[in-house]
Each structure stands twice: as structure tokens, then as C-alpha cells.
Regions:
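C-terminal nucleotide
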Residues: 1-16, 25-151, 158-185
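Conserved active-site tyrosine of GNAT-family acetyltransferases
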Residues: 22
Length: 185
């Protein structure tokens, strides 16, 4: 959790900070993000919480939500040491077919509560990111999938593990890594 006084994550890092900052200041997070030209996903996810599938479009439409329990003990974020600036990357050439494929795999994984399928979706998304010129992420022992968070090109990266033992071992072995857990109110 973050507040205006307690922000214990790096800024400009891909964790939805600009959307969160707008919400904490009483602004409409979706409008604030759209004004930056970066999309509505972060403030919509923050406002809704949980493990969500959203319909693509100009404004957020929630398709499906669950608690995310299948992710408990299986995720960590890794600080790459490089800030990123999503608005400066919005004009990059994108592989929309591969992005759509990753999204469809993720949607099916959430509906089926299938961790392995979700890891495949994350790996497909990472393939898109590499195609957009992002640097390869650090290999972490025990990780089954990883990708940059947010707009990528730096910031935090998500790493997924088969179980909490593997995740906790990776966190202990990698100083810039911290465990994260799903949150649903």
C-alpha cells in the first residue's frame, strides 16, 4: 500500500504510480492517465483491485474478476535500476497480433485459473517487449516467466515462480527483488 507520505517503491517504475498519485490527490486516475497518452489500465486496476480481465477499448470495461489466490506466494518484482517514461514510448512500433495473442492466453488462464497458462501469457508479452527493443531481463533461478511492468524499457519487472519456496529463495538471492502478493478487497 502507498500513501502521499509513504511511497516505498521506486517512481517512474511501471507500477502505476502516476495513476495512483492522481487517485491519492482526489483526481480521476483514468482521465489523468489518458491525458498523459498512456491508457487507463493502471488506475482502473488500482480502483477495482483483484485479478481482472478487462475489455480493450478507450475506457475500462471489466469482463471478469477473481481474487488472484492462485498467484499467492508465486510473484516477485525486480528493480532493474533504470527509470522509464511511458509517455515517451507510446509511438513505438508494436506487434499488435502478438499482443492480442498474449491477451487471449491471459484471459483464458484467468478464467481457467491455470497458472502455467498465465506464465505462457507473460512469456508471450515479454516476447513482444523484446521485439520492441527492451533489454533482456536478468535471469533469476526458479522463475518460470518474467516481463517488464508497465510500459517497460526499465522500471520493475515481474517474475513468476511455481511455488513460494522458489520465490522466497529468489528474493533472498537477489537484492533488488521483493515479494508481492495479490490484493482483492
Amino acid at each position: 500500500m502507498v500513501s502521499l507520505r509513504d511511497w516505498n517503491y521506486e517512481q517512474r517504475s511501471g507500477l502505476g504510480g502516476s495513476g495512483a498519485w492522481a487517485l491519492l490527490n482526489g483526481e480521476d486516475g483514468v482521465e489523468a492517465e489518458l491525458d498523459l497518452g498512456v491508457g487507463w489500465q493502471d488506475p482502473a486496476v488500482i480502483r477495482e483491485s483483484g485479478f481482472c480481465v478487462w475489455r480493450s477499448g478507450h475506457l475500462p470495461v471489466l469482463d471478469f474478476k477473481q481474487s488472484g489466490e492462485m498467484l499467492a506466494g508465486r510473484m516477485a518484482i525486480y528493480w532493474t535500476g533504470i527509470e522509464h517514461d511511458t509517455p515517451s514510448n507510446t509511438d513505438l512500433k508494436r506487434d499488435y497480433d502478438l499482443i492480442e495473442k498474449a491477451g487471449k492466453i491471459a484471459q483464458q488462464a484467468v478464467h481457467a485459473r491455470d497458472f502455467d497458462m498465465l506464465a505462457k501469457a507473460v512469456a508471450t508479452s515479454y516476447e513482444v517487449q523484446l521485439g520492441e527493443g527492451m533489454q533482456e531481463l536478468v535471469a533469476v533461478e526458479g522463475a518460470v516467466a518474467n516481463k517488464y511492468c508497465g510500459g517497460g524499457h526499465g522500471g520493475y519487472a515481474l517474475y513468476m515462480f511455481n511455488d513460494q519456496t522458489a520465490r522466497d529463495a529468489a528474493v533472498a538471492a537477489n537484492e533488488p527483488m521483493r515479494p508481492i502478493e495479490p490484493y482483492c478487497r
